[in-house]
Every structure is written in C-alpha cells, then in structure tokens.
Amino acid sequence: IARKLKTLPPVENENEFRSLLDKFFSFSLPKVFSAETLAIELAKRTRFLKEEVIHQELEDEENNSNQVLGFYDAFQKYLIAGLTKEDFADLYAQTIAYGLFAARTRTDGEFSRRLAYNFIPPTIGILKDVFQFISLGSLPQQMEVIIDDIAAVLNAADISKILQDYYKKGKGQDPIIHFYETFLNKYDPKTREQRGVYYTPEPVVDYITHSVNEILKTDFDKEDGFANTDVTVLDPAGGTLTFLAQTAKFAIEDFTEKYGEGHRTNFIKEHILKNFFAFELMMAPYAIAHLKMSFLLDEFGYKMKDTDRFKLYLTNTLEIEDLEQTRIPGMASLSEESKQATLVKRKQPILAIMGNPPYSIASYNKSVFIEEIMGLYKEDVKDEKNIQLLSDDYAKFIRFCHWKIEQVGVGVMGLITKNTYLNTSAFKGL
C-alpha cells in the first residue's frame, strides 16, 4: 500500500507501540542478577500482574467462578473495610511477588510457582491460604503465565548471594528489608510516598529501643527491661518489624547474658511469642516480617513449629470493626486474623509501644473509631484555622497509642514522628 501511495502513512499510536515492545523485550532474563537488577525485574513483572492481569480479573464480574474477585470481596468484608479494587490489585500483586520471594529464600533447589506452597511457613496463615490458590489452584491463563515468569526469575537468581551482598556493602544487618525498599521504589514510588513507607535506619531504632528499655527499668521497676516476662510490647505500624525484631533480639541477648542459654528456648516461646505484638496493613511487608522473625529466632536456636506464630496481624490499626467469620474456600485464616487483631486492640494490656507510623496529611484513615477518639485532641483547638494538620496519619497513630495506654493507665511510647506538633498551635490538644 505504501508503494502504491508513494508516501508513508502517518505514524499512529507510537508511544503505545514502543511500550508494547519494551514490555516484550524486558521479559528476557539476564544471566546474573544483582540486588538492583532482581528488584527491577520483579517490579516490572509485579506491576504488569497488577495492571494487566488482576485489574482485568476484578472487572470480570459476570464470571461466577472468578476467585480473584472472591478474594477481593473477602478482603474488603473481613479485613480492610473500604478497600478499593485498585488498592486490592496492588496488595494482591505484591503479596504474590513477595510470597514467592519468601518461599524462594527457604530453598536452594529448583523453584516454581507450584513448589512455592511447600515453602510458605504454616505460621503465616493468610499467605498459606493465598498460595493454596496460586500454587495448587486452577488459575486464569494470563495469571498463570506471569506468575510462572516471576517464579522463573527467582529460580534463576542466587538469593542467598544477593542478600549477603547487602552485608558486604555495609547496608546493615537487615538485607531482606533493604531489598524490599529497593523493590518498592522501582515498583511504585508514589504508593511508597503516600503510605509513608520508608525504612527506619538501624541507629534510630537502636536509640529508641535502648531508651525505652532504660525507662522500663528506672520508671516502671522492670529490672530486666524488655526481658521482663510481664512486659508487653506493641508496634502499631509494624511494617517489616524493624523495631520488634531489634527489641526481641535485645531481650533475648539480655536474658541469655543474665540467665544463660539453658532456658532461652522457653523464654522465646513464653515471652517473645506471647507478649510481643504488631499490626500491619500492607501484605507484602507483613509477609516479609513473618519471614524475618522466623530467621531471627532461628539464629537463637528456636525453630518455629507449625503451632507457633509471631503475633503480627494484618489489620488497619486505626480501624476497629467486629467482623463475622468467613467460610470462603482458602480464606479461613482471614476472618481469624481480623478477630485476633481486634482482641489485641480492645483487650490486650500493653506497657511499651514503639514504631515508625506513616506520615501523610492526605490521610486514608477515616474510620468511625479513629475520628471519634481524635475528638479529644480537637477540643482545645476548635477555633484554630489550620486544624486539618491534625488529620495527618502520624497524629492519628499517636492518638491510638494514647488510647491503648489509657486502657492500662500507665505506659511508654517511643515513636518516630514529624515535628510539626512542637511549634504548631493546631496540636495544642495533642
């Protein structure tokens, strides 16, 4: 046609065509992965899974056997009220990618989507339920192809070497978390900023942990600090458990130094696994954190059994809803998780609260519960013009911690926050 016309037709949809070519050629695997290149490859595929596959599945509402839509309904009804399809697609895609990553860290042999289920610890009930479908279920073809491809990337990568490289480069003692930061920055930096998801530097965590430990000893007469078996600890914005992992390590080392290794296993079982609590809203860091605690306790000679779990719950800290039980296949642990989290919020006495809550003035957290208890901080500033500043998530987390400590009457908080409350009149009530 071009020869007959003796002219070239005008270029149309050039950007879309280039984008298609980029996606096509980018799915070839490099021979050797660094942490950076692995994060990039996983991020590209996870973004594709979210935007081109899960989104499409969620729009197919006429398909009665659509399990992805069923999972969305279950998450919305039994875990995170008000969850949008867009947020679920993001949550679900990251869950699959990091669930595969978590499984891959537990084997040096051949790895695939179908084998992943065998390497998901039974203590992470929700993740185990998700992978019962991902690994063993009948997936939509386009979903199967992209998840198989993510598994192939992980199979080709030397995960142990990549994580060790973080140690060698002086990035600290938390390589899994540093890798997640790299992944998230490549995958969706905007969501990272909106959610206030940033890694907490280890020296800051050390400082706060040691400070709270001293306060427990001097002001609360807890001779062994965090190692006192009647001390309860909560991180309300657990993330990847940077704070509680350090606190647990600190407590175990203190206990061992003072009482020897003989009772250490029992100390971990009866104190660390019973009196340390955390909440997290995003499922990828939730999965990573469970993996991280399993590795940490393993370092101290404690192998987690099928009946053990660290008390980190997938929940919105600033929301308290009495949710009914679900019998949706593969989602049995979802309603149980919600139930356990609500019990901790309402009834579990907590003495020490530490963490790095999100900072976002455009807060997504507007539940009836948090808006009601924030009224206490607004009483003194009703005539202020800039009261919107009190809607920042970090202020709401401070109020939750305050409310939680009020249940007992005494307590200590060690939080990383913005400093706006120090010199802004809108925070007088706070």
Where are the model-predicted features located?
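Nucleic-acid nuclease catalytic cores
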Residues: 1-4, 97
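Short, polar/flexible loop-turn hinges at active-site or ligand-entry regions and domain interfaces
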Residues: 4-12, 32, 82-85, 111, ...
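Preference for the N-terminal adenyl/adenosyl cofactor-binding alpha/beta module
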Residues: 11-250, 275, 279-285, 292, ...
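SAM-dependent methyltransferase catalytic region
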Residues: 171, 185, 189-430
